[in-house]
């Protein structure tokens, strides 16, 4: 045993290497654990951000579903409004025989339009306005000297917006500049 102690004291380099080996192992292990911790923290932050994004998207989807739940139903009701309006346009206000029916149609139409407005459904009536391809569908072009080119001359069918989003475009006739005939030979001479 004395020989072993003697050898240990005679070879301090071996003893230092022996002591250094566990400390190098510990340092490497600490570094590996720190890297794992950093990776876990990064993954945790990413998961928290993803969870927040999923919640936000779900809230937006629910909000849109509430906002536009009536879209299909409202689209199905628009022909009824159109028919009531056409019926009133075609009936004579001076005809005493249908005066009561006409008043009933007017009241029904007003009630219908008020109900649609309560549910954020608004009409697009572009008569005289500049043509807007986002809200209007051009059915025809007509020359006109009375209004500027590319203005709405007539409205065949009103358009509608639901909560600011286009439900149905307005069917319109759009003005265009009159074509000037080429000068004749007599005018050139």
UniProtKB/Swiss-Prot annotation:
Which subcellular locations apply to this protein? Cytoplasm
Q: Which GO terms describe its molecular function?
A: adenyl-nucleotide exchange factor activity; protein homodimerization activity; protein-folding chaperone binding; unfolded protein binding
Answer whether the UniProt record assigns the keyword Chaperone to this protein. yes
Name the SUPFAM superfamilies on file: Coiled-coil domain of nucleotide exchange factor GrpE, Head domain of nucleotide exchange factor GrpE
Q: Which GO terms describe its biological process?
A: protein folding
Q: Where is the composition biased (Low complexity)?
A: 10-24
- Residue ranges of coiled coil: none
Q: Name one Pfam family in it.
A: GrpE
Keyword annotations from UniProtKB, A to Z: Chaperone, Cytoplasm, Stress response
Q: Among its keywords, does the record have Chaperone?
A: yes
Q: Where is this region: Disordered?
A: 1-24
- Which superkingdom? Bacteria
GO cellular component annotations of the record: cytosol
Oligomeric state and interaction partners are given as: Homodimer.
The role this protein plays is: Participates actively in the response to hyperosmotic and heat shock by preventing the aggregation of stress-denatured proteins, in association with DnaK and GrpE. It is the nucleotide exchange factor for DnaK and may function as a thermosensor. Unfolded proteins bind initially to DnaJ; upon interaction with the DnaJ-bound protein, DnaK hydrolyzes its bound ATP, resulting in the formation of a stable complex. GrpE releases ADP from DnaK; ATP binding to DnaK triggers the release of the substrate protein, thus completing the reaction cycle.
Concerning its family, UniProt says:
Belongs to the GrpE family.
Q: What is this protein called?
A: Protein GrpE
Q: Which organism is it from?
A: Ectopseudomonas mendocina (strain ymp)
Its taxonomic placement starts with: Bacteria, Pseudomonadati, Pseudomonadota, Gammaproteobacteria, Pseudomonadales
Q: Which gene encodes it?
A: grpE
């Amino acid at each position: 045993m004395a020989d072993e102690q003697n050898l240990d004291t005679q070879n301090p380099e071996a003893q230092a290497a022996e002591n250094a080996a566990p400390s190098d192992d510990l340092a490497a292990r600490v570094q590996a654990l720190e890297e794992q911790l950093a990776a876990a923290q990064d993954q945790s932050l990413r998961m928290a951000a993803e969870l927040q994004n999923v919640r936000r998207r779900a809230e937006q989807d629910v909000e849109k579903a509430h906002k536009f739940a009536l879209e299909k139903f409202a689209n199905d009701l628009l022909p009824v409004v159109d028919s009531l309006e056409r019926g009133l346009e075609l009936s004579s206000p001076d005809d005493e025989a249908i005066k009561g029916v006409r008043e009933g149609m007017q009241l029904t139409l007003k009630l219908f339009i008020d109900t649609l407005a309560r549910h954020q459904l608004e009409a697009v009536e572009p008569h005289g306005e500049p043509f807007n391809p986002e809200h209007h569908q051009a059915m025809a072009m007509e020359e006109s000297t009375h209004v500027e080119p590319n203005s709405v001359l007539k409205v065949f069918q009103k358009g509608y917006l639901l909560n600011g989003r286009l439900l149905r475009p307005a069917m319109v006739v759009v003005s265009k500049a009159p074509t000037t005939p080429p000068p004749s030979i007599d005018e050139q001479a």
